Amino acid sequence: MSFRTIEWRDDKVIMIDQTRLPGEEVYCEYGDYKSVAEAIRGMIIRGAPAIGVAAAMGVALGAREIIADTHESFLRQLDNVCDVLARTRPTAVNLFWAIERMKRVAADNCGGSLDEVREVLKAEAIRIEEEDLALCKAIGRHGAGLIPEGATVLTHCNAGGLATAGYGTALGVIRAAHEAGKNIQVFADETRPWLQGARLTAWELMKDGIPVTLISDNMAGFFMKRGEITCCVVGADRIAANGDTANKIGTYSVAVLAKENNIPFYVAAPTSTLDLSLENGDQIPIEERHAREVTHLQGLPVAPEGIAVRNPAFDVTPARYIAGIITEKGVITGDYTAKLKALVKP
């Protein structure tokens, strides 16, 4: 790919500003954990795996800001850093997975000097980024076989390189199928209200030379009924133990329409997106965002002033609508409760 979503460079975190795409390809530099937290909250970086990487790098930056005389004081202050990052966005479990991993690494390496702990945390954050890229490539390899020759694939939101350390989950499957020589095309839902499909997915696929057609969200059923959609592939922000999946708002509607039209609906996600502590999707916390995201577009009002607004950022697709969950370890179908549990066994 010709862009980098996030990287550690010269003890700074560099991110592409996704709020300014597709008009401008601008990279932002962050040298402290609070600014990384604001970047996550403000969706300069978004997508569950990507914000997990960002949170890990934020912890590494925060460790460098801590002034402490003892390991105990260092770990207490690091907990505060982690709390700030954890409060940014509540739904994507990768955020919390990455933070907990960084906390464990810090605790396990407190036998050396504090400077050594800081270096270990930096190395771990970079390792999380590198692992995510490798996981996405593996997801792509496992999922590519599900995409038939000549397929038209519908995707919702952006689960591409911009949502990960690179390559993508849902778009990773599409990329891998394209790289295998399959003649495929993509229909991208625009994905209101943030327009991740229009601004980000369309931009990514066009840069890669993969044929893509943009549609508004309420057109998906029309094209499904006409037989123009072969399958659907989306990403995930959190997957409960029974396979219920939280993803960008509107995903549930796509899944229901796909089921009605006998179109397979696949979820692509790394195992770090699994939350087996939750029995089902009803327990997944759903982030509600500011009304202005709905009432304004590109800074201009598109609704009457003072109108009541609801703006959940995610919805939950019940497992019964999902034909398969594509992970870096393979494709899971059928009894998700048993198979997901087996998937993460050490």
Curated annotation (Swiss-Prot):
GO molecular-function term, one example from the UniProt record: S-methyl-5-thioribose-1-phosphate isomerase activity
Keyword annotations of the record: Amino-acid biosynthesis, Isomerase, Methionine biosynthesis
Site (Transition state stabilizer): 157
Entry coiled-coil feature ranges: none
Catalytic reaction list: 5-(methylsulfanyl)-alpha-D-ribose 1-phosphate = 5-(methylsulfanyl)-D-ribulose 1-phosphate
BP GO terms, sorted: L-methionine salvage from methylthioadenosine
Chain sites annotated for binding substrate: 46-48, 89, 196, 247-248
Residue numbers annotated as active site: 237 (proton donor)
Key word Amino-acid biosynthesis present: yes
Pathway: Amino-acid biosynthesis; L-methionine biosynthesis via salvage pathway; L-methionine from S-methyl-5-thio-alpha-D-ribose 1-phosphate: step 1/6
EC id: 5.3.1.23
The UniProt record lists the keyword Isomerase: yes
Pfam families: IF-2B
Domain of life: Bacteria
Reported function: Catalyzes the interconversion of methylthioribose-1-phosphate (MTR-1-P) into methylthioribulose-1-phosphate (MTRu-1-P).
NCBIfam families found in the cross-reference section: eIF-2B_rel, PRK05720.1, salvage_mtnA
PANTHER family: METHYLTHIORIBOSE-1-PHOSPHATE ISOMERASE
Family according to the record: Belongs to the eIF-2B alpha/beta/delta subunits family. MtnA subfamily.
Protein's name in the database: Methylthioribose-1-phosphate isomerase
Gene source species: Geobacter metallireducens (strain ATCC 53774 / DSM 7210 / GS-15)
Lineage: Bacteria, Pseudomonadati, Thermodesulfobacteriota, Desulfuromonadia, Geobacterales
Gene from which the chain derives: mtnA
